[in-house]
Every structure is written in C-alpha cells, then in structure tokens.
Amino acid sequence: DALGRGNFYLCGHDRGGRVAHRLAVDHPGRVDRLCLIDIAPTLDMYNATDMRFATAYYHWFHLIQPNPLPETMIGGCAVAYLHAKLGGWGSRGLSYIEPEALIEYERCFCTPEAIHAACEDYRASAGIDLVHDRESRARGDKIACDTQVLWGERGVVQQLFQPLDLWQAQCAGIVSGQALPAGHFIPEELPLETAHALHTFFR
C-alpha cells in the first residue's frame, strides 16, 4: 500500500522466498504470480530432517542456538564463514562472484549487528514462522496464484526434496518450474537465465 501498488508479481530467493510464501498466503488477493527460488516449504524441510539434511543444512540448527553462542563463533571468523557459505551448497567456489561484489558482501555481513540479525532470522524461522505455517495448514490456507519454482541442479533442494510436488500441495494455482544448472545462489550464478525465466513467467 505504501508503494501505491494494488496487485503485484512477487519473487524471492531463499529467505526472501519464505517471506514471499508467507505474504502470498496472508494476502492472496494481492499477489498475481509468485516465483520461489531454491526452497521447499519450510515446514516440510524441518519435518523431513534426517542426517543428510542436518549435515547439508547444519546452519539451520546452529544459528537458532541461544545468543551469543552462534554470534560469537561466527564473529571470530566472519570472512571465512561467509566465503564457506557463498562457495558451498553446490556453488563450486566463489568464482561466480565479481571481486567487487564479494568485498561488498564482506562489508555488509561481517559486523556484529549483521551476524546477530542473521541468527535472529533463523531463530524466527524455527519459531514463530513454524507456528504460522502449522496454523495455516490446519486451516487449509494455500497460495492462491500460479507459482513458478526454480532450483539448482547441484543444490540441496534437488538432492533431498521434490519441490514441484511439495509446492503444488501448498498452492491452489498451477505450479510449474525447473532445475537450473547451478548451486544454491542461482540469481548470482545464472543471472541471464534467471532473468529469462522470470520474464517468461511474469509477462
């Protein structure tokens, strides 16, 4: 409303995708089309936790530990931690990131405030967000609009989940999508391909 827009197309990657999912469920009349990048539904991911998932996404369980434990551990080696995350999850290192962009990532992430905010984000995901997701499912709430799902061929979503099936179960509209030849950071690894997929779906 503050932007003066009525209905809109919405796209989110990773945590942005989870926010987009919640927004589309809470305001079904406002989102005309939705694109979710490299996620399965949060509740399904937590419910399917096994050793493979916990190993690949250990940070989901590390970052939710009480403050200040994860903040202190990450803060002691913030650049190394950031590089490990950006270069992992099927991304095959940092070569896909321009040097100037990597410097900016480091500047933005490697502060106590940013690290704490990241941890709080994951704490919310394992806390109030799960409460809302469970309540929504109990009511039968679904995403009303057509939804596109994109995920990386080398990522955890591809390895451990069936994203189209999981999202179709949460959507009243049509779910389509595909795996792209990337790891987790699809927009950065494949910017042109991502833009093409979005343009095709949203036009």
Predicted regions and their residues:
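Catalytic histidine-centered segment of alpha/beta-hydrolase-like enzymes
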Residues: 183-195
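Hydrophobic "lid"/C-terminal helical patch
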Residues: 194, 198, 202
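Flexible "cap/lid" subdomain of the alpha/beta-hydrolase fold that forms the substrate-access gate
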Residues: 1-11, 15-180, 187, 199
